[in-house]
Every structure is written in structure tokens, then in C-alpha cells.
């Protein structure tokens, strides 16, 4: 958006920034200046001339010979090709030797010339040839008040035009008034004065059928206007920001748009059938817009119509048929508030954007509609003549202000600042956001209510006001400070809904949750239990029993995915399993005591461990991958230290948790980890190994310990030692790990790094070698060799006495 500094000074006469200071300050306020255009005065040899005579060029149809009075006593002959030259026009004349710099940046010097056989001593200039605008439709026409022979620079002013990038949340800054509000205190803004217009209601001039899309609409009929070129000052204002003047009526609406940010539209009143305006959203017809493109209007688009057809797309663009022309004598001036969502939808559907839609889409000031209309009417009466025949309004203007509360302590907490409450009030008052209370604000106040003006549509809540305080106070004035982190006591309670907590952990472990039907086929359930709960009247063989656990349901999901080409799976489910109770375990609570319902967490993995890649061999997941997942789950529940993994058979290990309740310690069976056997895989039609784990949710919740106990890192070095034991094959390696950890508190961690099984030798007991890597550390000091040897001796002695394990001899 282009902003003229001279235009800004109409609103802020005291504006004292130099160009670089203004650019820096606007950017600092969040209105980034993308480019700066310095508009300089033309060469002194460009003077004011008056065309006295125009005659055709004898040798060229498109050229004309102009005799121009430049105040030198003799008329100057100039050959000109502009289509708009006429006798009596005041024009800029570049005399011999004048150096011109065009808008394009090209520089050229005027020299005597002979054009198609006719002498030409100078050039009648268009605005773009003088570097004043990009208008090249004809020569530049000057006011009659200009004195012949005087340098044109005398009647022009230097200006600086800023190209500002306005963010979507700041539609209030899409005008010169909006930018002026940023540069000066609210009370320093000078608003142009215009007579108050009394808009009547119910006169029949307006009918709004879609009040949601157009809550407020005004129409003013002005008769007896004279449409013609705009005064030089008005045309110059528009040229400075890159707009091409058209005629005085259209130029006034554009001037109001860029001054106040309120789009207006003028219709030729005699082209409106029925002399009335209807705003509706059910039109379905073709429409020729001002850009001479035909659009197909659809129901749902906000359209302004006369008694017969659409004459404008509401908030977007007017129609060509009702446009103001040189023959127009009576106009209808529209000033309205269109719903941003409605304009955005219509503009997007039609792929049509305009200066008006750009502002309506983002939100114009609803309280500015009437004032902008009044000022436009005053300008039209002054410049184009005529008189107001009627002025009518429909609907009500939205509320003028919003009330938003601000807590000074919250501001300083967010910004890391120490701004006083009274300073915050003063900062916000600069941009017309005023405290509701008229009393002086004390610095220890808890909350302050502010009245937000209607043009700040982006301010809805406290954090928006905090942003404004930071912006006005200056981000560069915020002193760097340590990050303040609020400290809250760690809750030791069980999460409000424990199954959801388990779900969040599993998702964090890269598993996908599935939801399955608890009713399954009997053949599938038989693979996992004989104590099945049968459905009395099953609707199909697929739904004849309740699942005893979640395994059959998960395996069905695995099979479905494999048949559809998805063979790498990590799935889990938290749900219920159902089994019959043995007679001995039933209570006396009624028929339901014959059944046992358990809440379970089940998980399966299958397929490749990692995606296929050129730099590594394919490896499938195995039993230990799933065991690792279970260990991570137990660790997050703070249960790993209390858990033990016991081998049930070659394919299954059990998970047991040591629990202490009421002073009694017990070992509870929490679940299993297993490789699904081949017979079960065949039942479910699976052709690759699947690994399954199942845990009792109720038991996990009972044993769960919330909270993280912080353990600071040791200040002293860690010592590593390796031990290789030979132990009977039937003893799980986990027992050796647990025993090593329990031997001495200075044993920080134990892990297996090698296993060697030499097989069975006749006449000798069956043994295997398990190599352990131990990390030792003492929090009270550095361990010397004597201390290290003592710990290692304890581990070796305990392994020998408890497990019959001996150190492997090399």
C-alpha cells in the first residue's frame, strides 16, 4: 500500500520525521516499509504554457501541430501526438535544454527537432514523462490559475511515497488516516470537517434483503453534478500513490478510500431501473463489471441490484452499465458496511479482487461509514456542484466499541518487563484505546478495563492489548532478563483417566491405536482361552463369543493390513476382555459373578525394523524389540525397577511386578510378552512372525507411581568393567543382571554385550556364557582400584552363591 507523506500531513500537520526516521519508526511499529519513492520537482526549464491553436499535421494523421504561448512574446510551435490536446489547455512545456527523468528512470534532454517535416521546439509533457505518475493517456492538464511562463515546479511539491506492507490483522492501517494514528497521539489527529447529513429511513430508496451480509447501507442521491476532470490538487494526490485520475466523482471516491479506508461507489442515478437499490444474495445472472469482464453471479453472492438487474458486486466492484460518465448529471453515492466473510467468499468465487474488497475482506471501521459519506458528499458539492436530493440509511451500525480488560501484572509476566500500570494507560491512550474509568489508575491495580475503538477489529482479548503495550513501549526497550519459569509441585496422583495416559505413552512410542469389536468368531477365541463367554443369540458366526483378551482382535487387524499390502505394523488397543470364572473363583454377587471382565493393554509388532534402504540389510523385528517397548512403558510408569521378566517357555516370558500394600509385599502377574506360534498365525491367515504383549491395566494403575524423582548427575567419573560368566542354560540372563545390580549401590547399570552358547556336551552340564558390561560410580568420590575390586568381588561372589555362575576362563 502506497502512502504519501504530504497526504499524511493533512492529518498530522506536526509530523516532523525525516524520511529515514519515518521509515524506521513505521517498521518499528510493525508497518514494514518495503520501498521508498522520492518524487522530485521537474527541471526549471519545464514551464507552464497555454495551447493557443491546434491544427492537423500535414504529413501524419496521428500528430498535431500546437501553437503554445510560453510567455516569451512569440508562440512556440510544438508537434504533439497526445489525443487530448485542445486549444485553451494549460500544459507543462519542456523547453529546449530541459532534462527530464521519466517514471521508468530514463533520462533524456529536449532538443530542437523536425518531426515529419515540421519544426518542433520543445515537448508538451505527460505526467509520466515528468516522473510524476505512470499516466501516459494524454498530456498533463494544469489548473487555469497557473501563470504562463512560470516554472512548473512552482506549482508542485516534493513528496515521499512509502510502500508499506500491512499485515492481514491490521486493516485499520490501510489508509492515510490509519497510518497517521500510528504516528501521532490520538488527540493530535486533525479530522477534516464536513456538514452532518441526516439520513432518513424507510423512504423506499433502499431495500436490504440480506442483512447478515450487509448490516448497514446508506445511499445519497445528488442531482445536478457536472462530471469532468478533477482539480489539480486532487488528481495530484491520486497520482502520488499510483492511481490514474478518471473524473471528479470517481476520483473523490478513491480519495476517500485512501484517506479514511472506507470504500464508496457512485452510480449513474438515471441508469438505475426503478430508482432504487436492493441488496440481495439470490441473484443468478451474468454481470459486466467496471473492468469490462463478464462474471457469472451465483446464489450466495452479495449483489447490489436495481429494480431489474445487478448493478454492483457488493463490496467488490461496480457494474459498467451504471458507471459515472461525462454525461452523468445525477448520481447515487453508496457507503456501506459489508460482512468481511461474505465479501471474501464472493471475491474468491469470482477470482476478482479490488481496492474495496481488499479492505472489506479484512474489516473496515463500521463507525466510519457515515463520516466518510458526509465528507465525500461535501467534496462532490464543492467540486462537481449539484445538491443533495435525498439521503437514506438501512440497518444499524455495529457497536462503536468493545471492552477488554488488562492485568498489568500479566503484561509484565509476558514481556519480562516492569512497566507501571499508569504507563500502560498512557501508551494505549496514544492509539485511542482508553481506560473506561475516568479516575487515575494506581500502579497496584489488579485489572484495568479499556474501551477499544471500532477501527481496531484485531483487538479481541487481553493478549492483543499486551502486544500493543509491547509495540508502543518498544521492543528495544525491553531489558533482557532470565526466563521466569513457574514452578509447580509434581503431582503424585494417578492421572485422571489412566487408560488415556497409557494411550498417550503408546502413541509416543510410535504405535497406532486401533478400536475393534469385542465380539469375534469362536475359532479365533479358542486359540487363547477355553473359558469363553458365548452370545446366546449371535447374529452371525463372526460375532458368536466375547473375546477372552485383545489378542484375537489385534491379529485380525494385522491380517487385514497384510492383505492390503501393509506389512510393517506397530499397533495397540486398550479395551476389555471377558472370560468365565472357574466355579471355585465365583462369588455370591449374582449371575454376573460367573464372568470376569478385565481391562487390558495389548500391542503387536511385525515386519521390518526399519524402512528398506540401500545402505543396510533388511532386519525384521523380533521378540526383544517388543520386550524393549514394554520396558520403556514400565519405565514411564516408574515400575521398571519393581518388574521382573520370567521365562515361561521358549516363546513367552511373564511380567511380574512387586507391590507393597498395607505393609505386605506381594509379586503380581502383570502380563506376558510372546511370539505368536505358527498354529495361531495360520488361523488368522498370517504368513510372517508376529510378536504380542498384553498387560493388565487395572494392575498397572494400582502399582503406578506418578512423578519424577530428580537424581543429579554424578560429579565423579564412571568406571566400566566387563565380566564374562558361565552359568547353567536354564537360568535366565535377567536374573544375573538383577543380581549384579543388587550387589552394591555403586553398580549404576548392567547390560549384556555378548552371549555364547557352546551347546550340550555329553557327560557335562548344559551351560552358556553371558558377558556383562558394568558401570560403577560413587557419588561421594572417585573410585580407586581397591573400591572397584571390592564391588567386582561382590558381584562374582553373589553370582556363584545364588546362581552357580563362575567367571569364564580364557
Swiss-Prot record:
> Which positions fall inside the tRNA-binding domain?
40-153
Can you supply one Gene Ontology CC term for this chain's record? phenylalanine-tRNA ligase complex
SUPFAM superfamilies on file: Anticodon-binding domain of PheRS, Class II aaRS and biotin synthetases, Nucleic acid-binding proteins, PheT/TilS domain, Putative DNA-binding domain
Cofactor: binding details: Binds 2 magnesium ions per tetramer.
Reactions performed catalytically? tRNA(Phe) + L-phenylalanine + ATP = L-phenylalanyl-tRNA(Phe) + AMP + diphosphate + H(+)
User: Which positions are annotated as binding Mg(2+)?
Assistant: 458, 464, 467-468
Q: What is its EC number?
A: 6.1.1.20
Cite the InterPro entries for this sequence: aa-tRNA-synth_II/BPL/LPL, B3/B4_tRNA-bd, DNA-bd_dom_put_sf, Fdx_antiC-bd, Fdx_antiC-bd_sf, NA-bd_OB-fold, Phe-tRNA-ligase_IIc_bsu, Phe-tRNA-ligase_IIc_bsu_bact
Q: Keyword Hydrolase on this protein?
A: no
- Which Pfam families did the record assign? B3_4, B5, FDX-ACB, tRNA_bind, tRNA_synthFbeta
* GO terms under biological process: phenylalanyl-tRNA aminoacylation
Among Gene3D superfamilies, the record links this protein to: 3.30.56.10, Bira Bifunctional Protein, Domain 2 (3.30.930.10), Ferrodoxin-fold anticodon-binding domain (3.30.70.380), Nucleic acid-binding proteins (2.40.50.140), Phenylalanyl-trna Synthetase, Chain B, domain 3 (3.50.40.10)
The entry's keywords: Aminoacyl-tRNA synthetase, ATP-binding, Cytoplasm, Ligase, Magnesium, Metal-binding, Nucleotide-binding, Protein biosynthesis, RNA-binding, tRNA-binding
Residue span(s) of domain B5:
399-480
Question: What cofactor is this protein dependent on?
Answer: Mg(2+)
Q: Which residues form the FDX-ACB domain?
A: 714-808
In which compartments does the protein localize?
Answer: Cytoplasm
Superkingdom in the source lineage: Bacteria
Example GO molecular function = phenylalanine-tRNA ligase activity
NCBIfam families noted in UniProt: pheT_bact, YtpR
The record's section on HAMAP family has: Phe_tRNA_synth_beta1
Similarity field:
Belongs to the phenylalanyl-tRNA synthetase beta subunit family. Type 1 subfamily.
Oligomer status and interactors: Tetramer of two alpha and two beta subunits.
Please identify the protein, giving its name as recorded.
Answer: Phenylalanine--tRNA ligase beta subunit
Organism name: Chlorobaculum tepidum (strain ATCC 49652 / DSM 12025 / NBRC 103806 / TLS)
Give the lineage. Answer: Bacteria, Pseudomonadati, Chlorobiota, Chlorobiia, Chlorobiales
Amino acid at each position: 500500500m502506497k502512502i504519501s507523506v504530504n497526504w499524511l500531513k493533512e492529518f498530522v500537520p506536526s509530523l516532523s520525521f525525516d524520511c529515514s526516521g519515518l521509515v524506521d519508526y513505521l517498521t518499528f511499529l510493525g508497518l514494514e516499509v518495503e520501498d521508498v519513492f522520492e518524487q522530485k520537482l521537474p527541471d526549471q526549464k519545464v514551464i507552464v504554457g497555454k495551447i493557443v491553436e491546434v491544427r492537423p499535421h500535414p504529413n501524419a494523421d496521428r500528430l498535431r501541430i500546437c501553437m503554445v504561448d510560453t510567455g516569451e512574446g512569440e508562440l512556440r510551435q510544438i508537434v504533439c501526438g497526445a489525443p487530448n490536446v485542445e486549444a485553451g489547455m494549460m500544459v507543462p512545456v519542456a523547453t529546449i535544454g530541459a532534462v527530464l527523468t521519466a517514471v521508468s528512470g530514463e533520462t533524456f534532454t529536449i532538443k530542437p527537432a523536425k518531426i515529419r517535416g515540421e519544426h518542433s521546439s520543445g515537448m508538451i509533457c505527460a505526467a509520466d514523462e515528468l516522473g510524476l505518475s505512470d499516466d501516459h493517456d494524454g498530456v498533463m492538464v494544469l489548473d487555469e490559475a497557473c501563470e504562463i511562463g512560470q516554472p512548473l515546479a512552482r506549482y508542485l511539491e516534493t513528496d515521499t511515497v512509502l510502500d508499506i506492507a500491512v499485515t492481514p490483522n491490521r486493516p485499520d492501517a490501510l489508509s492515510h488516516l490509519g497510518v497517521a494514528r500510528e504516528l501521532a497521539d490520538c488527540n493530535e489527529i486533525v479530522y477534516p470537517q464536513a456538514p452532518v447529513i441526516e439520513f432518513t429511513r424507510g423512504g423506499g430508496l433502499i431495500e436490504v434483503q440480506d442483512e447478515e451480509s450487509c448490516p448497514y447501507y446508506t445511499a445519497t442521491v445528488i442531482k445536478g453534478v457536472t462530471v469532468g476532470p478533477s482539480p489539480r490538487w486532487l488528481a495530484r494526490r491520486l497520482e502520488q500513490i499510483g492511481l490514474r485520475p478518471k473524473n471528479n466523482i470517481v476520483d473523490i471516491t478513491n480519495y476517500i478510500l485512501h484517506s479514511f479506508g472506507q470504500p464508496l461507489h457512485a452510480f449513474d442515478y438515471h441508469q438505475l431501473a426503478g430508482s432504487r437499490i436492493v441488496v440481495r444474495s439470490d441473484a443468478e445472472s451474468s454481470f459486466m463489471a467496471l473492468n469490462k469482464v463478464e462474471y457469472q453471479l451465483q446464489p450466495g453472492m452479495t449483489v447490489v441490484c436495481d429494480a431489474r438487474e445487478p448493478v454492483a458486486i457488493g463490496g467488490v466492484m461496480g457494474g459498467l452499465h451504471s458507471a459515472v460518465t461525462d454525461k452523468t448529471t445525477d448520481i447515487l453515492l453508496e457507503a456501506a458496511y459489508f460482512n468481511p466473510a461474505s465479501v471474501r467468499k464472493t471475491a474468491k468465487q469470482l477470482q476478482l479482487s479490488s481496492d474495496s474488497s481488499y479492505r472489506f475482506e479484512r474489516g473496515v471501521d463500521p463507525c466510519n461509514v457515515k463520516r466518510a459519506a458526509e465528507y465525500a458528499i461535501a467534496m462532490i458539492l464543492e467540486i462537481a456542484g449539484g445538491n443533495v436530493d435525498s439521503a437514506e440509511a438501512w440497518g444499524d451500525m455495529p457497536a462503536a466499541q468493545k471492552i477488554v480488560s488488562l492485568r498489568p501484572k500479566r503484561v509484565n509476566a509476558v514481556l519480562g518487563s516492569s512497566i507501571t500500570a499508569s504507563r500502560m494507560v498512557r501508551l494505549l491512550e496514544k492509539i485511542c484505546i482508553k481506560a473506561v474509568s475516568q479516575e487515575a489508575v494506581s500502579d497496584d491495580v489488579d485489572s484495568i478495563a479499556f474501551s477499544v475503538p471500532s477501527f481496531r477489529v484485531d483487538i479481541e482479548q487481553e493478549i492483543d492489548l499486551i502486544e500493543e503495550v509491547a509495540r508502543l513501549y518498544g521492543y528495544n526497550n525491553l531489558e533482557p532478563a532470565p526466563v521466569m519459569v513457574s514452578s509447580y509441585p509434581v503431582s503424585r496422583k494417578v492421572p485422571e483417566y489412566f487408560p488415556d495416559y497409557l494411550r498417550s505413552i503408546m502413541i509416543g512410542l510410535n504405535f497406532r491405536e486401533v478400536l475393534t469389536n469385542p465380539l469375534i468368531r469362536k475359532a479365533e477365541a479358542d486359540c487363547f482361552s477355553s473359558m469363553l463367554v458365548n452370545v446366546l443369540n449371535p447374529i452371525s458366526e463372526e460375532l458368536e463369543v466375547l473375546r477372552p483378551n485383545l489378542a484375537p482382535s489385534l491379529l485380525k487387524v494385522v491380517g487385514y493390513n497384510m492383505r492390503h499390502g501393509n506389512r510393517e505394523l506397530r499397533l495397540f488397543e486398550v479395551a476389555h476382555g471377558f472370560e468365565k470364572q472357574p466355579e471355585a473363583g465365583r462369588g455370591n454377587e449374582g449371575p454376573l459373578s460367573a464372568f470376569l471382565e478385565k481391562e487390558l493393554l495389548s500391542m503387536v509388532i511385525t515386519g521390518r525394523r526399519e524402512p528398506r534402504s540401500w545402505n543396510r540389510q533388511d532386519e525384521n523385528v523380533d521378540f526383544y524389540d517388543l520386550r524393549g517397548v514394554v520396558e520403556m512403558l514400565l519405565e514411564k510408569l516408574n515400575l521398571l525397577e519393581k518388574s521382573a521378566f520370567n521365562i515361561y517357555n521358549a516363546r513367552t516370558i511373564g511380567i511380574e511386578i512387586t507391590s507393597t500394600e498395607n505393609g505386605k509385599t506381594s509379586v503380581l502377574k502383570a502380563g506376558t510378552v510372546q511370539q505368536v506360534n505358527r498354529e495361531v498365525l495360520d488361523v488368522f491367515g498370517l504368513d510372517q512372525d508376529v510378536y504380542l504383549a498384553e498387560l493388565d491395566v487395572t494392575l498397572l494403575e494400582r502399582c503406578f507411581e506418578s512423578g519424577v524423582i530428580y537424581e543429579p548427575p554424578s560429579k565423579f567419573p564412571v568406571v566400566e568393567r566387563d565380566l564374562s560368566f558361565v552359568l547353567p542354560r536354564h537360568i535366565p540372563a535377567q536374573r544375573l543382571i538383577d543380581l549384579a545390580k543388587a550387589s552394591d549401590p555403586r553398580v549404576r547399570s548392567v547390560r549384556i554385550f555378548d552371549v555364547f552358547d557352546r551347546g550340550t556336551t555329553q557327560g557335562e552340564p548344559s551351560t552358556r556364557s553371558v558377558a556383562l558390561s558394568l558401570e560403577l560410580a560413587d557419588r561421594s568420590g572417585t573410585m580407586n582400584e581397591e573400591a572397584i575390586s571390592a564391588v567386582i568381588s561382590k558381584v562374582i561372589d553373589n553370582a556363584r552363591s545364588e546362581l552357580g555362575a563362575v567367571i569364564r576362563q580364557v
